[in-house]
Amino acid sequence: ISFYSKYEIIEKGSIPFVSNGDAMYADVMVKGKRIRFVNVYLEPFQLHKSMVKPTSDLDENGAKAKSLVRRFMPVFKKHEEQVQILKNFIEKSPYPVILAGDFNSVPNSYEYYTISGVLKDCFLESGTGLATSFHDYKIPIRIDYVFSSENLKSTHYQVDRSQKLSDHYPVLVKFSLKD
Protein backbone atom coordinates (compact mmCIF):
# COMPACT_ATOMS: atom_id res chain seq x y z
CA ILE A 1 0.00 0.00 0.00
CA SER A 2 1.14 3.57 -0.58
CA PHE A 3 0.13 7.22 -0.62
CA TYR A 4 0.28 9.77 -3.42
CA SER A 5 -0.76 13.36 -2.73
CA LYS A 6 -0.72 16.68 -4.50
CA TYR A 7 -0.82 18.22 -1.02
CA GLU A 8 2.06 18.39 1.43
CA ILE A 9 2.58 15.24 3.51
CA ILE A 10 3.52 16.41 7.02
CA GLU A 11 4.08 13.04 8.65
CA LYS A 12 3.76 9.39 7.66
CA GLY A 13 4.24 6.01 9.24
CA SER A 14 3.11 2.42 9.47
CA ILE A 15 0.57 0.90 11.80
CA PRO A 16 2.06 -2.40 12.94
CA PHE A 17 0.10 -5.58 12.25
CA VAL A 18 1.42 -9.00 13.26
CA SER A 19 0.36 -10.83 10.10
CA ASN A 20 -0.01 -10.46 6.33
CA GLY A 21 -2.19 -7.35 6.51
CA ASP A 22 -0.76 -3.87 6.25
CA ALA A 23 -1.71 -0.35 7.32
CA MET A 24 -0.08 3.03 7.11
CA TYR A 25 -1.01 6.65 7.69
CA ALA A 26 -0.10 10.04 6.27
CA ASP A 27 -0.95 13.44 7.71
CA VAL A 28 -1.67 15.81 4.85
CA MET A 29 -2.24 19.58 4.88
CA VAL A 30 -5.35 20.35 2.84
CA LYS A 31 -6.29 24.03 2.60
CA GLY A 32 -4.62 24.75 5.94
CA LYS A 33 -6.23 21.81 7.74
CA ARG A 34 -4.30 18.70 8.80
CA ILE A 35 -6.08 15.47 7.88
CA ARG A 36 -4.91 11.96 8.76
CA PHE A 37 -5.29 9.47 5.90
CA VAL A 38 -5.12 5.79 6.80
CA ASN A 39 -4.69 3.12 4.13
CA VAL A 40 -5.40 -0.49 5.11
CA TYR A 41 -5.21 -3.99 3.69
CA LEU A 42 -6.60 -6.55 6.14
CA GLU A 43 -5.39 -10.14 6.17
CA PRO A 44 -6.34 -11.85 2.88
CA PHE A 45 -8.28 -15.11 2.75
CA GLN A 46 -6.10 -16.34 -0.13
CA LEU A 47 -8.94 -18.07 -1.90
CA HIS A 48 -8.73 -19.57 -5.35
CA LYS A 49 -11.65 -19.82 -7.74
CA SER A 50 -11.63 -23.62 -7.57
CA MET A 51 -12.24 -23.41 -3.80
CA VAL A 52 -15.58 -21.64 -4.20
CA LYS A 53 -16.80 -22.98 -7.54
CA PRO A 54 -19.65 -25.47 -6.97
CA THR A 55 -19.69 -28.83 -8.73
CA SER A 56 -22.46 -31.32 -9.44
CA ASP A 57 -21.10 -33.60 -6.67
CA LEU A 58 -22.85 -32.77 -3.38
CA ASP A 59 -20.21 -34.56 -1.30
CA GLU A 60 -17.45 -32.56 -2.96
CA ASN A 61 -19.38 -29.33 -2.37
CA GLY A 62 -19.81 -30.26 1.30
CA ALA A 63 -16.08 -30.93 1.63
CA LYS A 64 -15.33 -27.57 -0.02
CA ALA A 65 -17.64 -25.79 2.39
CA LYS A 66 -15.96 -27.39 5.42
CA SER A 67 -12.55 -26.52 4.01
CA LEU A 68 -13.59 -22.89 3.55
CA VAL A 69 -14.84 -22.65 7.13
CA ARG A 70 -11.50 -24.02 8.41
CA ARG A 71 -9.68 -21.47 6.25
CA PHE A 72 -11.89 -18.56 7.35
CA MET A 73 -11.65 -18.96 11.12
CA PRO A 74 -7.95 -18.02 11.59
CA VAL A 75 -8.35 -15.09 9.17
CA PHE A 76 -11.36 -13.78 11.09
CA LYS A 77 -9.28 -13.93 14.28
CA LYS A 78 -6.49 -11.91 12.62
CA HIS A 79 -9.06 -9.41 11.35
CA GLU A 80 -10.34 -8.96 14.90
CA GLU A 81 -6.82 -8.11 16.10
CA GLN A 82 -6.10 -5.81 13.14
CA VAL A 83 -9.39 -3.93 13.47
CA GLN A 84 -8.82 -3.35 17.19
CA ILE A 85 -5.38 -1.88 16.39
CA LEU A 86 -6.97 0.37 13.74
CA LYS A 87 -9.81 1.43 16.05
CA ASN A 88 -7.36 2.38 18.82
CA PHE A 89 -5.20 4.30 16.34
CA ILE A 90 -8.21 6.21 14.99
CA GLU A 91 -9.54 7.05 18.45
CA LYS A 92 -6.15 8.51 19.45
CA SER A 93 -5.84 10.67 16.33
CA PRO A 94 -5.77 14.40 17.10
CA TYR A 95 -6.81 15.07 13.47
CA PRO A 96 -9.85 14.21 11.33
CA VAL A 97 -9.40 10.78 9.73
CA ILE A 98 -10.12 9.33 6.30
CA LEU A 99 -9.72 5.54 6.36
CA ALA A 100 -9.73 3.63 3.07
CA GLY A 101 -8.76 0.21 1.88
CA ASP A 102 -9.40 -3.45 1.31
CA PHE A 103 -11.04 -4.84 4.44
CA ASN A 104 -11.69 -8.30 2.97
CA SER A 105 -15.01 -8.12 4.85
CA VAL A 106 -18.62 -7.56 3.88
CA PRO A 107 -20.86 -4.79 5.33
CA ASN A 108 -22.54 -7.06 7.91
CA SER A 109 -19.19 -8.13 9.42
CA TYR A 110 -17.48 -7.53 12.75
CA GLU A 111 -14.83 -5.49 10.92
CA TYR A 112 -17.38 -3.13 9.37
CA TYR A 113 -19.44 -2.84 12.55
CA THR A 114 -16.37 -1.98 14.66
CA ILE A 115 -14.99 0.69 12.31
CA SER A 116 -18.42 2.21 11.62
CA GLY A 117 -18.68 2.72 15.37
CA VAL A 118 -15.86 5.30 15.25
CA LEU A 119 -16.08 6.61 11.66
CA LYS A 120 -18.91 7.06 9.17
CA ASP A 121 -19.23 5.06 5.96
CA CYS A 122 -18.84 7.52 3.09
CA PHE A 123 -20.93 5.35 0.76
CA LEU A 124 -23.94 5.75 3.06
CA GLU A 125 -23.40 9.51 3.07
CA SER A 126 -22.88 10.18 -0.64
CA GLY A 127 -23.05 6.96 -2.66
CA THR A 128 -25.73 5.32 -4.76
CA GLY A 129 -26.21 1.82 -6.10
CA LEU A 130 -24.41 -1.22 -4.72
CA ALA A 131 -20.79 -0.02 -4.27
CA THR A 132 -19.50 -3.50 -5.10
CA SER A 133 -15.80 -3.21 -5.82
CA PHE A 134 -14.46 -6.78 -5.87
CA HIS A 135 -15.20 -8.53 -9.15
CA ASP A 136 -12.86 -11.48 -9.52
CA TYR A 137 -15.14 -14.44 -8.70
CA LYS A 138 -18.18 -13.19 -10.62
CA ILE A 139 -19.74 -12.58 -7.22
CA PRO A 140 -19.93 -8.80 -6.84
CA ILE A 141 -19.27 -7.97 -3.21
CA ARG A 142 -18.36 -4.87 -1.26
CA ILE A 143 -15.11 -5.34 0.66
CA ASP A 144 -13.40 -2.01 -0.08
CA TYR A 145 -14.47 0.97 2.03
CA VAL A 146 -13.86 4.63 2.67
CA PHE A 147 -14.74 5.92 6.14
CA SER A 148 -14.30 9.41 7.58
CA SER A 149 -14.58 11.45 10.75
CA GLU A 150 -17.83 13.32 11.38
CA ASN A 151 -16.27 16.71 10.61
CA LEU A 152 -15.45 15.65 7.04
CA LYS A 153 -18.30 15.43 4.52
CA SER A 154 -18.18 13.12 1.53
CA THR A 155 -19.94 14.73 -1.41
CA HIS A 156 -19.46 12.04 -4.06
CA TYR A 157 -18.78 8.29 -3.85
CA GLN A 158 -18.19 6.18 -6.95
CA VAL A 159 -16.84 2.75 -7.84
CA ASP A 160 -15.15 3.19 -11.22
CA ARG A 161 -16.03 0.01 -13.09
CA SER A 162 -14.35 1.27 -16.26
CA GLN A 163 -10.90 0.64 -14.73
CA LYS A 164 -9.82 -2.99 -14.21
CA LEU A 165 -6.51 -2.33 -12.49
CA SER A 166 -6.70 -5.48 -10.33
CA ASP A 167 -9.40 -7.76 -8.93
CA HIS A 168 -10.84 -4.62 -7.28
CA TYR A 169 -12.32 -1.58 -8.99
CA PRO A 170 -11.06 1.81 -7.76
CA VAL A 171 -13.26 3.65 -5.26
CA LEU A 172 -13.33 7.44 -5.69
CA VAL A 173 -14.62 9.79 -3.00
CA LYS A 174 -14.78 13.60 -2.94
CA PHE A 175 -14.85 15.51 0.34
CA SER A 176 -15.65 18.97 1.57
CA LEU A 177 -14.18 20.30 4.79
CA LYS A 178 -16.68 21.26 7.48
CA ASP A 179 -15.77 24.10 9.83
Predicted regions and their residues:
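Short aromatic-enriched loop/helix-cap "lid" or pocket-rim segments at secondary-structure transitions
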Residues: 48-52, 109-112
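Short, well-ordered beta-to-alpha junction loops that form the rim of enzyme active sites
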Residues: 39-42, 101-105
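Structured beta-strand-rich core segments of catalytic domains in phosphoester-bond hydrolases
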Residues: 1-50, 146, 158, 162
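Metal-dependent phosphoester-hydrolase catalytic domains
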Residues: 14, 80-81, 88-97, 103-179
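Soluble or luminal CAZymes and related metallo-dependent hydrolases
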Residues: 18, 71-85
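A solvent-exposed, charged loop/short amphipathic helix patch at secondary-structure junctions
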Residues: 51-72
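Short acidic/polar alpha-helix capping motifs at helix-coil junctions
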Residues: 50-53, 77, 123
